[in-house]
Amino acid sequence: DCCHNTQLPFIYKTCPEGCNL
């Protein structure tokens, strides 16, 4: 998922609006 940080799954990366998993 583009919103999940691969190192810390509970932390969200910056990604385009609409990707808010």
From Swiss-Prot:
Keyword Membrane (UniProt): yes
GO cellular component: extracellular region; membrane; other organism cell membrane
Molecular functions (GO terms): toxin activity
Keywords from the named record: Disulfide bond, Membrane, Secreted, Target cell membrane, Target membrane, Toxin
PTM remark: Contains 4 disulfide bonds.
Keyword Disulfide bond: yes
Source organism, top-level taxon: Eukaryota
Subcellular localization: Secreted; Target cell membrane
Known tissue expression: Expressed by the venom gland.
Segments forming a coiled coil: none
Principal place of residence: secreted
Miscellaneous note of the record: Is classified as a P-type cytotoxin, since homologs have a proline residue at position 31.
Family: Belongs to the three-finger toxin family. Short-chain subfamily. Orphan group XV sub-subfamily.
Function: Has hemolytic activity under low-lecithin conditions. Has low cytotoxic activity. Inhibits the expression of VEGF and bFGF in human non-small-cell lung cancer cell line NCI-H1299 in a dose-dependent manner.
Name of the protein in question: Cardiotoxin-like basic polypeptide ah
